[in-house]
Amino acid sequence: EEGSLLSGMRAITLRDSLAEAIIYHLSRDKSLIAYGEECRDWGGAFGVYRGFSDIIPINRLFNSPISEAAIVSTAIGYAISGGRAIIELMYSDFIGRAGDEIFNQLAKWQAMSAGELNLPIVLRASIGSKYGAQHSQDWTSLLTHIPGLSIVYPATPYDAKGLMASSLCSNDPTVFFESQRLYDKVEIFTENGVPKNYYKVPFGKAVKRRSGKDITILTIGASLYAALDASIELINHNIDTEIIDARSLVPFDYEMLLNSVKLTGRLLIVSEAVERGSFANTIATNVSKFAFKNLKASPMIIGAPNWIAPGADMEKTYSPQSEDILDLVFRDFFPEKRINKRGLRKDWDFLDLAKKGL
């Protein structure tokens, strides 16, 4: 009697949002097949397809051998024969096991056929957490380096459903990254939560998560939530943060980012990929070129350190946390506002580290 009313938001998880978009297409497009390791028996590595085996026949939802090369290459053959496929690699770390198939076949056959061949393939790849060196790497930047692929990385249930719908409508190959840490996240940004109805989120459109006037923080994937936590602390020091969620890496929404940077004059990019060779560096370089006159400071990036991912007990020292964002913002953008030694952490010789590839 004394409790408050439950929220009216439809609070389904990111996992369930993916499932809604996929089952919509599977039930309507008989040419669409879905497969990967344990996709039928277990619903996939992380349960996105759970319950699908009661609806979708075994010839359209099935288990594959433990061979990433076979998973990708058979999808390519099926697609160029007129089919459509959504395939799952259990961890993005295993992209290397299908290197030629992704880099030289999936990405290139449309161009090599002068547009005669379509490759309507969605490659789902999860970014691991808590599983150490070989199962916890963010390889988004590796894929953005390959021309011919669309790359998306949703951080919210609403975007996961909408971007998956767009991916399954595309005739181009799409790599769809998913963070294992976000599978159980519910929607907190969209009024009324994730719609029951079908909808699409377009590629190449970022979204503003928070408006501010002092600094722009661009987030890629799961780093959105660390940035949101940092923004709460920053406002206590009169630093008003604008947060933009990239959502789509290829194509990328430079218009929204540049409009924000022209207002704030400062840019920090946060990604969980290692900093060396990160796509965040490409974005920072382009912003320096396109908005040079508007910048009050050089764009900065925060990523994972340039070394091997540690085990679960050390993971918070590896992927960027809100404290790392605060340290950099106070140290490099607002040194006059730092307090309690915030911004003085990591008193290293950064030039020496760069020379050593660290």
Annotate each predicted stretch with a short phrase:
Residues 1-177, 180-358:
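Thiamine diphosphate
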